[in-house]
């Protein structure tokens, strides 16, 4: 079978033995995310026609207004994972605490926890900008047969066994890694099937795009300001092109395909950064590294940061390897 005619289901079956633990459970988790993503995609595509755009009148744990689609997507992903009884715990951007999944027999026998941002960039729905889902999978560290604890979730990114994202754009794509490269699958909406469309995705070592909210320039640390000036200077192959959508998944996806760097630094308004380590930065860092890129907080490898809380925030520099290296150089020289 030609690679590009291969479905996601066929790809998972063929590559199951390359998974770190050769587990059917992990394959079922990816399949569950695929199913939930198709349901969410249907709602996203109808967002302008029904009453599911705009704010729901509540705030999540971060104090951010919850969009109606945020709430819907969160429920769909959680219920899909719970109903299939394949995980022992779930953590979401939209929930204050983690969810313990005991299973119908109350055995707590499953081995994996899933962390997710069910609908990244959902504030853009009203203006028809691409949004996405981000997910991360860890093997639990507490004994099987016992309820999960916070320690099962507070693991460094290097412990991830799978990570990925779904981008709901002009086409819907699911991109994921299990530590053996990155592959992208595009949904054929006519038959509801994901097909392998982007095998072995790779960052270029160098890129020509930088992505950040330059409207916050005055609030950025000096190292970031210096890097922006470097990107804009007319030397060598510069100036670089500035492209910023405001949806992490969308900006990351474009930069991985075209070559570039995404930066969400600390600022005087957000001294710890804005993005969450466990269900935004760590999974994207895993994907980036598997695609030959690099991810950092400006000084340290994202994948090696030991989380201390579920909704911990960190600054995020991610993209083409040499671009992130250069940004780190500016940060360290002005520390």
Swiss-Prot record:
<feature type="binding site">
    <location>
        <position position="93"/>
    </location>
    <ligand>
        <name>Mg(2+) 1</name>
    </ligand>
</feature>
<feature type="binding site">
    <location>
        <position position="117"/>
    </location>
    <ligand>
        <name>Mg(2+) 1</name>
    </ligand>
</feature>
<dbReference type="GO" id="GO:0042132">
    <property type="term" value="F:fructose 1,6-bisphosphate 1-phosphatase activity"/>
</dbReference>
<keyword id="KW-0119">Carbohydrate metabolism</keyword>
<dbReference type="GO" id="GO:0005986">
    <property type="term" value="P:sucrose biosynthetic process"/>
</dbReference>
<feature type="binding site">
    <location>
        <position position="213"/>
    </location>
    <ligand>
        <name>substrate</name>
    </ligand>
</feature>
<dbReference type="GO" id="GO:0006002">
    <property type="term" value="P:fructose 6-phosphate metabolic process"/>
</dbReference>
<comment type="similarity">
    <text>Belongs to the FBPase class 1 family.</text>
</comment>
<dbReference type="GO" id="GO:0030388">
    <property type="term" value="P:fructose 1,6-bisphosphate metabolic process"/>
</dbReference>
<dbReference type="InterPro" id="IPR033391">
    <property type="entry name" value="FBPase_N"/>
</dbReference>
<feature type="binding site">
    <location>
        <begin position="120"/>
        <end position="123"/>
    </location>
    <ligand>
        <name>substrate</name>
    </ligand>
</feature>
<dbReference type="InterPro" id="IPR020548">
    <property type="entry name" value="Fructose_bisphosphatase_AS"/>
</dbReference>
<comment type="pathway">
    <text>Carbohydrate biosynthesis; gluconeogenesis.</text>
</comment>
<keyword id="KW-0460">Magnesium</keyword>
<feature type="binding site">
    <location>
        <position position="119"/>
    </location>
    <ligand>
        <name>Mg(2+) 1</name>
    </ligand>
</feature>
<feature type="binding site">
    <location>
        <position position="274"/>
    </location>
    <ligand>
        <name>substrate</name>
    </ligand>
</feature>
<protein>
    <recommendedName>
        <fullName>Fructose-1,6-bisphosphatase class 1</fullName>
        <ecNumber>3.1.3.11</ecNumber>
    </recommendedName>
</protein>
<keyword id="KW-0378">Hydrolase</keyword>
<dbReference type="Pfam" id="PF00316">
    <property type="entry name" value="FBPase"/>
</dbReference>
<dbReference type="GO" id="GO:0005829">
    <property type="term" value="C:cytosol"/>
</dbReference>
<feature type="binding site">
    <location>
        <position position="120"/>
    </location>
    <ligand>
        <name>Mg(2+) 2</name>
    </ligand>
</feature>
<feature type="binding site">
    <location>
        <position position="117"/>
    </location>
    <ligand>
        <name>Mg(2+) 2</name>
    </ligand>
</feature>
<dbReference type="InterPro" id="IPR044015">
    <property type="entry name" value="FBPase_C_dom"/>
</dbReference>
<keyword id="KW-0479">Metal-binding</keyword>
<dbReference type="InterPro" id="IPR028343">
    <property type="entry name" value="FBPtase"/>
</dbReference>
<comment type="subunit">
    <text>Homotetramer.</text>
</comment>
<dbReference type="GO" id="GO:0006000">
    <property type="term" value="P:fructose metabolic process"/>
</dbReference>
<dbReference type="GO" id="GO:0006094">
    <property type="term" value="P:gluconeogenesis"/>
</dbReference>
<dbReference type="InterPro" id="IPR000146">
    <property type="entry name" value="FBPase_class-1"/>
</dbReference>
<feature type="binding site">
    <location>
        <position position="244"/>
    </location>
    <ligand>
        <name>substrate</name>
    </ligand>
</feature>
<dbReference type="GO" id="GO:0000287">
    <property type="term" value="F:magnesium ion binding"/>
</dbReference>
<keyword id="KW-0963">Cytoplasm</keyword>
<feature type="binding site">
    <location>
        <position position="280"/>
    </location>
    <ligand>
        <name>Mg(2+) 2</name>
    </ligand>
</feature>
<dbReference type="Pfam" id="PF18913">
    <property type="entry name" value="FBPase_C"/>
</dbReference>
């Amino acid at each position: 079978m030609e690679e590009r005619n291969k479905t996601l289901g066929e790809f998972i079956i063929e590559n199951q033995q390359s998974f770190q633990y050769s587990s059917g459970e992990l394959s079922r988790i990816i399949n569950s995310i695929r199913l939930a993503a198709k349901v969410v995609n249907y709602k996203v595509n109808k967002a302008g026609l029904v009453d599911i755009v705009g704010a729901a009148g509540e705030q999540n744990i971060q104090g951010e207004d919850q969009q109606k689609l945020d709430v819907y997507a969160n429920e769909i992903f959680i219920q899909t994972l719970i109903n299939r009884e394949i995980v022992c715990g779930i953590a979401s951007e939209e929930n204050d605490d983690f969810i313990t999944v005991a299973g119908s027999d109350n055995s707590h026998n499953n081995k994996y926890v899933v962390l997710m941002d069910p609908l990244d960039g959902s504030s853009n729905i009203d203006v028809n900008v691409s949004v996405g889902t981000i997910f991360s999978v860890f093997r639990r560290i507490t004994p099987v047969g016992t309820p999960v604890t916070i320690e099962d979730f507070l693991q460094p990114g290097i412990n991830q066994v799978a990570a990925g994202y779904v981008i709901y754009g002009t086409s819907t794509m699911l991109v994921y890694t299990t530590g053996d490269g990155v592959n992208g699958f595009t949904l054929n909406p006519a038959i509801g099937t994901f097909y392998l469309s982007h095998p072995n995705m790779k960052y270029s070592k160098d890129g020509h795009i930088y992505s950040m909210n330059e409207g916050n320039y005055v609030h950025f640390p000096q190292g970031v300001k210096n890097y922006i000036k470097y990107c804009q200077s007319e030397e060598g192959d510069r100036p670089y092109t500035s492209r910023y959508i405001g949806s992490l998944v969308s900006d990351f996806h474009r930069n991985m395909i075209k070559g570039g760097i995404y930066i969400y630094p600390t600022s005087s308004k957000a001294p710890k950064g804005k993005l969450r380590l466990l269900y935004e930065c760590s999974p994207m860092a895993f994907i980036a590294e598997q695609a030959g890129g690099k991810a950092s907080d400006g000084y340290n490898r994202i994948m090696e940061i030991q989380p201390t809380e579920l909704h911990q925030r960190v600054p995020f520099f991610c993209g083409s390897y040499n671009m992130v290296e250069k940004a780190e150089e500016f940060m360290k020289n002005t520390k």
